[in-house]
Amino acid sequence: ADFTTGAPTPTNSGNEAPAPQPEEPAEPEQPAPEGVTAIADIQGTGAESPLKDQTVATEGVVTGVWSEGGLNGFTIQTGGTGAEATDASQAIFVYMGDKPADQYPALEDSVEVTGKVSEFYGSTQLTASTVSQLDTPLEKVTPLKVDQLPEGTEAREPFEHMLIQPGEHTVTNNYSLNQYGEVGLAPGKEALRQPSDIFSPSTDPNSDIQKLTKDNAEKLVTLDDGRTRDYLKTDQNTPLPYIAQDDAQTIKSLRTTDTVSFQHPVIVGFSHEQWRFQPTTPVTGNAAGADLPISWEDSRAAELHAIDDVKGEYTIGAFNVLNYFTSLGEEFGGSAYTDREGNKVTVNRGKTRGAYTQSALEDQERKIVAAINGLDADVIGLSEIEDGYAVTGDFA
C-alpha cells in the first residue's frame, strides 16, 4: 500500500473531529534549486560564499571522507580540476550531521549534492539534504602541486577544501599532538623562530616582535588527523596519530625541527582560526605508516648519543622533583588525592602542594634521591621545590 503524510485528525468516541486549533506558521521551505551550480560559484572569490543561506545543487568528485572522529562530512571537488590554481576554490565541504557512515560516499565517487550553503567558523560548507551517485563518472581530480601555501588568510582562500600535494615542511610545534592530534608546520626546512627569543617584548604593532609574530601566524599551517576528538578526554584509549603507527606497534618520535615530506595528498581546511592540512580519511595510531600523509626520519636516536660526544670533565643535569613540599597538606588543610586503598597521598586543593602526609613525603623523598643518584651528574639543578615563605610566611 502507498501512504502519504498529512495533518492528524483525532476523533472523540463519537467519531467527530474536534474543531481545528490555530497553529504557529511554519518556517518557509527553501525553494528547490534550479539546475546544478558550479562549486566555484558557490565558493566565490571572497571570504564568504555569495550564495550563503541558499539551497543549491552541485556535483563533484569525492576527495576526502570523515565519517568517524567528529568532522562528520566529506569534500567534493569539480571534476577535472587541480592541474592549475584558480581564483575561486573548486572544492567544498559537505556536512552530513548525524547520518550513519553507510550513507557516506567513497573516495573518488562522483556525486550530486543538494544542500544549504553556510559559513561554519569561516569555512564554506553545504549541509547535505540529498547525496546521490552520478550515472556518469566525472573526470578525475588532480592534486594541485603547492610547495607551500601563500601567506595570510586572503591568499589561502582559493585553496579552501582543495586536494593538494604540498612540498617539504618542518615541524615547528607539537603542543597539541597529545590532545587533538595536531602538528604545527612551517614551510621549507626551518622551524619558525620564537619572536621573544630574538626581540624584546612590546605591544606596539610596528615593533619587531609583533611583526614577526604576525609573520609566523601567516606562514603556519597545522597538520591535523581528520578528527576533532580530544585524546585526553573522549579518546583516551585511542593511540595518538603519527607518533604511533601500525595498530600502535610502531612508535616513532616527531620532534620540532624534523622535516616531513608528503607521501599522500591532503585537503586544505580552515577551522578554529587555523589553516590545516587534513588527511583524506581520519588517522589514529592504528593507521599504517604507509597510509599517513607524511613521512620523516626519526631524529631521536641520533640525539640520544649526542651527549656522549661532548668534551669536558663535568656533567650538569636538571631534575624536576614534582612539587617537593615539606609543608604537608594535613597540616595546612585542603583536599587530597587518594591511593587505591583510600589513603590520602597528594594535595588536591589547598595552600600547599605535593605530599599530604609525612608518610607520603618520605616515600617521595626516597624516589627523588634514587632518581637523582641515577643521573650520575656532578652538578644538578632542581625545580618545583617549595617556597616556604609563600606557604608559611616564615623566612626561616
Predicted regions and their residues:
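Extended non-catalytic accessory segments flanking core domains
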Residues: T4-A17, E27-V347, D363-A370
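Intrinsically disordered, low-complexity, repeat-rich polar/charged segments
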Residues: P20-P22
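The substrate-binding groove and active-site-proximal loops of carbohydrate-active enzymes
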Residues: G350-S359
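Active-site surface patch of divalent metal-dependent phosphodiester/phosphate bond hydrolases
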Residues: Q358-A396
